[in-house]
Swiss-Prot record:
Protein name per UniProt: Nucleotide-binding protein lp_0779
Residues noted as binding ATP in the record, renumbered to the chain: G12, M13, S14, G15, A16, G17, K18, T19
Pfam assignment, any one: PapZ_C
Superkingdom per UniProt: Bacteria
Native source organism of the sequence: Lactiplantibacillus plantarum (strain ATCC BAA-793 / NCIMB 8826 / WCFS1)
Keyword annotations of the record: ATP-binding, GTP-binding, Nucleotide-binding
Amino acid sequence: MAESLQLVIISGMSGAGKTVAVQSFEDLGYFCIDNMPPALLPKFSELVEESGKIKKVALVIDLRSRAFYDEIMDMLANLDNTDFVSTRILFLDASNEELVSRYKETRRSHPLAMEGRVMDGVRKERELLAPLKDRASYVIDTSTLTPRELRESIFDKFETDQDETFHIEMLSFGFKYGLPIDADIVMDVRFLPNPYYIPELKKLTGLDKPVADYVMQQPATEAFYQQFLSMLESIMPGYEAEGKSSLTIAIGCTGGQHRSVALTQRIGEALAKHYKVHISHRDIEKRKETVNRS
């Protein structure tokens, strides 16, 4: 049986980073197409399959109108019934405020802002794209990412992951820097004792053994850890059965330095015994950046 075409559909909010995404996929060896009319994709896929010369395609789809959106959903329905194409959707997102800021910096108009108000266009686009985001294999929140960090995130997900194995993204974060909007599950651990107030631990992080030991040795932490891990292990089969290719679990504390980092590491390592797990710490460098600026 011939190898199926690996198709990645890149979509998401206007201004969320699709240009950087295309460049990243080109570097990964994908044949990239920008804004092909969705109705042409099934025929294009057939031609590619017949030629046998192209194995990986990344297609960028932007929202132009409600009719264009309807074409996208029809296209996805057709691809679901195609056995020679393996389709994954990458949805790029960012907070409304960050998207508005980016548009103001570039002085561009939003494609859906009929009266010139960028925020109105962003809100309308988010509403239209909600069903597509729900279908996405991967959602990346670019609100706090640099272009380099977005590129690294794409490489992490697509450089070697050519199968459909269910995997888990474990993410620590600080509430003071905002919620990660790409998370499926968010857990707040600010109820645990904070190492920040221990002088010898304040400048360390949850990756350092003294901090990890302090956090994990608290009675409240052990009880939470056992119960939360048990819950996660009980619901994972359901997410797999629903066809999700990935699940993002975000654990947050105040600054994303100590408690959330230690617990994200510990829970991620436990889940890695049974699942493919990627662990990242979104805000662990924030304090270093603050110190360098002071």
